[in-house]
C-alpha cells in the first residue's frame, strides 16, 4: 500500500481541521478550536490504488509559525487553504507557498489551492482570482465546503494525483540517467 504524506496549511479559521475531519470522519465540526497540530490516517482507494493518507492538520495561528518548517520538510504535498469570505487568508497563500518552496528547496512541490467555505453566501475572494492564482502557480484549484462536503474528497484526491505525477517525474528523470544522486547531471572523466 502506497503512503502519501499530506499537509494542510492556511491561515487560522479557514477550515483546515473541518476539511480534514470531514474527509476522515464524515462529519462537520462547526465550533472553532484552534489547532496546534493534529495527525490523521485514512486508507482510501484512488484510481484503483489503495492508498494510506497520512494527513497533518497544522496551526494557522501566527504564534505557531516556528513549527511550520518542520512539518513542511516531511510533507510530500500541500493543500493550501483559504476561506472564500476572507481576503487576508487568500493573500496569505503566497507566504505559505514561498515558505514551502524555501523549506523544500524546490519550485516543484505538489500543491492544490483550496477555496473553502463555498457554501457561504458572502464571498470576498472571486473564483476567477483564485483560478488565476492557481494557474500562475501551475497547480489545481478546487472550491470546497467542509459543511456540505462539496469538493472535500476531490481536493485531497487531486493532491494525491499531483504527488503521483511528481513521483513519476522524479523516477523517470533518475532512470534516464540525467540525474545523479545529488540531483545533478553525472559526468564521467
Curated annotation (Swiss-Prot):
Residue positions of the PTM Phosphoserine? 89
Q: How is it modified after translation?
A: Palmitoylated by the ZDHHC9-GOLGA7 complex. Depalmitoylated by ABHD17A, ABHD17B and ABHD17C. A continuous cycle of de- and re-palmitoylation regulates rapid exchange between plasma membrane and Golgi.
Lipid-bearing positions (S-farnesyl cysteine): 186
The reply on keyword Lipoprotein is yes
* Positions of the propeptide removed during maturation: 187-189
What EC number(s) is this enzyme filed under? 3.6.5.2
List the coiled-coil residues. Answer: none
Task: List every stretch annotated Hypervariable region.
Answer: 166-185
Q: Cross-link Glycyl lysine isopeptide (Lys-Gly) (interchain with G-Cter in ubiquitin), residue numbers?
A: 170
The record's section on Pfam families has: Ras (PF00071)
Activity regulation as described? Alternates between an inactive form bound to GDP and an active form bound to GTP. Activated by a guanine nucleotide-exchange factor (GEF) and inactivated by a GTPase-activating protein (GAP).
Q: Which GO terms describe its cellular component?
A: Golgi apparatus; Golgi membrane; membrane; plasma membrane
Q: Where is this motif: Effector region?
A: 32-40
Tell where it localizes.
Cell membrane; Golgi apparatus membrane
Q: Which reaction equations make up its catalytic activity?
A: GTP + H2O = GDP + phosphate + H(+)
State the protein's name.
Answer: GTPase NRas
> What is the organism of origin for this protein?
Rattus norvegicus
Q: Organism classification, top ranks?
A: Eukaryota, Metazoa, Chordata, Craniata, Vertebrata
Q: Which gene encodes it?
A: Nras
